[in-house]
């Protein structure tokens, strides 16, 4: 992919309503994002800051290994003792689509679920907004919420964990 093609993609992304865009090729990945979490902290301090599209080119591992400098040294990683590791119990409810997660029906309403709540199969856990459509994510089984893995208004990916039910 040449520079002009990348510039064209960037211009199209900038004028679109997309918040994130990932383009994979044999050469690597091209990631565009308009999300505020990717912005430089100095921009957020300005009075009328406008989100600036961020571009990140991530090369494939074979390309990065070939171009890595010889001065990079392998450092052994020490393993942590098993006693300190935390193993969470329960099943993770995954996102069925890409979108924005909402933990409540509206900002002034209480969340659908909280840690410790008992839920019934089919009860709404989260709403995911995708293309201006609100999609309810139901509980796949009866159980107790042990962990909420996303925050309100997080941009989430397909298959990303939303809540853990035991």
From Swiss-Prot:
One Gene Ontology MF term:
acetyl-CoA carboxylase activity
Q: Which UniProt keywords apply?
A: Biotin, Fatty acid biosynthesis, Fatty acid metabolism, Lipid biosynthesis, Lipid metabolism
Positions of the Biotinyl-binding domain: 90-166
Concerning SUPFAM superfamilies, the annotation shows:
Single hybrid motif
Keyword Acetylation appears in the UniProt entry: no
Q: Does the keyword Lipid metabolism apply?
A: yes
Composition bias of kind Polar residues appears in: 61-70
- Name of the protein in its database record: Biotin carboxyl carrier protein of acetyl-CoA carboxylase
Query: Which species does this protein come from?
Result: Streptococcus pyogenes serotype M6 (strain ATCC BAA-946 / MGAS10394)
Q: What is the lineage of its organism?
A: Bacteria, Bacillati, Bacillota, Bacilli, Lactobacillales
């Amino acid at each position: 992919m040449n520079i002009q093609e990348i510039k064209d993609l960037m211009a199209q992304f900038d004028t679109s309503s997309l918040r994130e865009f990932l383009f994979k090729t044999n050469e690597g990945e091209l990631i565009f994002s308009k999300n505020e979490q990717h912005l430089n902290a100095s921009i957020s301090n300005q009075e009328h800051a406008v989100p600036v599209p961020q571009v990140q080119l991530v090369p494939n591992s074979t390309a990065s290994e070939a171009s890595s400098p010889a001065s990079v040294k392998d450092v052994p990683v020490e393993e942590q003792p098993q006693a300190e590791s935390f193993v969470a119990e329960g099943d993770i409810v995954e996102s069925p689509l890409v979108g924005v997660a909402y933990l409540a029906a509206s900002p002034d309403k209480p969340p659908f679920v909280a840690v410790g709540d008992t839920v019934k199969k089919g009860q709404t856990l989260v709403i995911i907004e995708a293309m201006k459509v609100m999609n309810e994510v139901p509980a796949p089984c009866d159980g107790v919420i042990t962990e909420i893995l996303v925050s309100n208004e997080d941009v989430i990916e397909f298959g990303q964990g939303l809540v853990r039910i035991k």
